[in-house]
Design a protein with these regions (language model features):
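Rossmann-fold scaffold of SDR-type NAD(P)-dependent oxidoreductases
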Residues: 32, 91-106, 152, 199
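C-terminal helical subdomain
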Residues: 208, 212-258
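Canonical Rossmann dinucleotide-binding motif of NAD(H)/NADP(H)-dependent dehydrogenases/reductases
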Residues: 25-51
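A hydrophobic alpha-helix adjacent to the NAD(P)-binding/active-site core of NAD(P)-dependent oxidoreductases
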Residues: 66, 112-115, 123-124
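Catalytic loop of short-chain dehydrogenase/reductase
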Residues: 104, 109-119, 147-183, 187-191
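Rossmann-fold cofactor-recognition segment
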Residues: 63-75
């Protein structure tokens, strides 16, 4: 008997069970962030997970089931909570796909002298503070007796152990802060909500507005379409469980050092 084959088949069976379970998950799924990745994830989930009521949440979208939400605005979050409370389905899945690398005024810093406090605060607001405050907003709706998944898109550049090139001070630090927030939260929720799972995700470099100014530095085979990135991320979320909560995982399912 080949023990390697037994182990491999057992692992495959476990993953298949996870996929089957996820496909039977019933309830409300919220995808927060109506940019390229978020919209694609919401689209793919609504097609593949027929028992989930998928709602895309963000500032604007033509998605068929959409809630307006400014994740950086406390009043908007209160209205968001009211919509969850009034919804008939149990909350089962939240995916945060918000993030900002650049804007008209915000640019990733190449060296120390480029640092600006206002820009640093903007980066931390959307990339660190808002995701954890989103978790705070939805916490009261986490089911006690059903599995619940919260996934947040981070970035490999937020890894301190993986930082080999420097630069991008604010974005790196903000994503590192997000990672620390959710690592701590995964420990708290493991005690309070044993069926909850938190996953931090690195989607790779995706062909969206966030990364578009930097595409020339990315090899063609490492620049993913939103469709491919969505498939990677959904498959990762499907295969997580409370036993693996608090992990920082790349698009290829490899674990990233903190």
């Amino acid at each position: 008997v080949n023990t390697r084959d037994i182990c491999t088949n057992h692992k495959k069976s476990f993953l298949e069970l996870k996929r089957i379970y996820f496909s039977k998950m019933k309830g409300l799924a919220l995808v927060v962030g109506s940019g390229g990745i978020g919209t694609q994830i919401a689209t793919d989930l609504s097609k593949s997970e027929k028992e989930l009521d998928v709602v895309l949440c963000g500032r604007k979208s033509q998605f068929n089931s959409f809630w307006e939400l400014d994740i950086e605005d406390s009043q908007s979050l209160l209205q968001f909570k009211s919509k969850i409370s009034n919804h008939s389905s149990e909350l089962r899945l939240v995916i945060n796909s918000t993030g900002r690398l650049h804007s008209e005024t915000l640019k990733p810093e190449k060296r120390l002298q480029h640092l600006d406090k206002k820009n640093m605060m903007e980066s931390f607001s959307i990339n660190a503070f808002s995701p954890i405050l989103l978790a705070k907003a939805i916490e009261e709706f986490i089911p006690k007796n059903s599995d619940f998944n919260f996934a947040s898109i981070s970035a490999r550049v937020g890894s301190i152990g993986d930082n080999q090139t420097g630069g991008w001070y604010s974005y790196r630090a903000a994503k590192s802060a997000q990672n620390q927030f959710f690592k701590s939260l995964s420990i708290e929720w493991a005690r309070r909500f044993p069926k909850a799972t938190i996953t931090l995700l690195h989607p790779g470099t995706v062909d969206t507005d966030l990364s578009r100014p930097f595409h020339k530095f990315v090899p063609e085979h490492k620049l993913f379409s939103t469709e491919k990135s969505s498939q990677f991320l959904i498959n990762i979320i499907k295969n997580q469980s409370p036993a693996s909560t608090g992990k920082f995982i790349a698009w290829d399912s490899s674990e990233i050092p903190w």
